[in-house]
Each structure stands twice: as structure tokens, then as C-alpha cells.
Amino acid sequence: YWKEVDVYIGGSEHATGHLLYSRFWQYFLYDLDLVPVKDYAKKLINQGMILGNSAFISREVGTDNYFSKEIVKNVKTQLIHVDVQFVNTNNELDLDALRNWQPQFKNAHFESLNNKFIVHREVEKMSKSKYNVINPDQICNDYGADTLRLYEMFLGPIEQAKPWNTAGISGTYSFLKKFWNLFHSTGKFYVDDNNPSKESLKILHKTIKKIEEDINDFSLNTSVSAF
């Protein structure tokens, strides 16, 4: 009864914690002839993390003076994390939102050019402590959950760490609409019993074969691009 599972999926923390612990006990039980297999999983996948694009502002050490990115000061500064929800696509910080966010910013002095306070950006682990966590609820509201799922698969190989960037999500949404329109026309389900052409059957079976192979290999990003 006790045999290996088909697939084990875990991140880097699992590889140095849970996985190490569980493999130790599997080897131990195998050496005692209590289980029939040496490894408890047929396939191991360490999925990469979705990284966040953090935002920082420069603060003069020991003061409440903050400087926009393009302003160079001959003073010692340190970078402070700020919430990415206050930063627009041009890396401009909403100072009013920042002042209302935490007491330390309420009476601080912010120096910028042309009334545009530019933040520093850096890709790092997505974490609440770094204020770079993206809430998917807004994406689901704007584009739907299917678009979010498909876009995540399309970001890249499952094993690689990937920075979160929604720049291409509108293209994924458009693809799903086109796919939907293949079977729905003017609000009605559109399927007929006409015999498909040889070319259509060739494309169909080629696509089925590609997707089946990619799913078995967990190459979900290339499976999506096959469409």
C-alpha cells in the first residue's frame, strides 16, 4: 500500500526543510525493508517564486528628509520600503497616500523635481514586510479568474522564479475572448455537425498532442503558447 506519490511540488523552503525530513524517513524505512521504494515521489518539481517589484524611497539618515530618485545629495541616505500600491506605472509616488499610511511620513519633508517624487525599484521576494504583495482580486474583477490563471502559466517555466508584471495581461484576456468566440456567436453556442477539413483535423490533433506532452512535462507556459 505504501508506495511513491506521482508528483511532489514544493519551493526552495521545502527542499531544505520538509523534503529533507520526509526523504530521511523514507530512506530509513526503506533500509528496514518496511517500504518497497527508496524515494517516496516519482517526480519532484521545485517551483519558482513569483517575485515582487519593490518600491523604495531615500531617507537622509537621522532625519525626516526624503529625496526623489533623480535628486543626488551629498548626504548619507538609506532606502525605505514603501507600499507598491502608492506607486503608478511611471514610478511616481502618491505622497498624500504615503502620509496617511504611516505616522513617520505624516510630517516628513519630501524633495522632488517638478512635483514628481520618483521611487527606486528592485525585484525581490514577494513579502508583506517588503510591501510588494499584489492582491489578485482587482485582476479578477477586471479580467476574470481564468485570465489570471492563464497569465500565471504563461509567465515562464514552473521551476524558474519570475517577477510579477501585468503588462501583458490584456493580451491574455484578448486571447480568451477570441477562444470563446470560436464556440459562441452572437450570444449563442455555435457548434455544427459539418465534417471538418483535413487541415482542421491536422491542426486539432497536433495541438492536442502538444498540450498533452506539455502537461505531462509540466511545461505549462509552452502549452499555452501552442494556441
What is each residue range found by the language model?
Residues 198:
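Gly/Thr-rich phosphate-binding loop signature of adenosyl cofactor/nucleotide-binding cores
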Residues 1-189, 203-226:
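Structured secondary-structure scaffolds
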Residues 190-194:
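NTP/phosphate- and nucleic-acid-binding module
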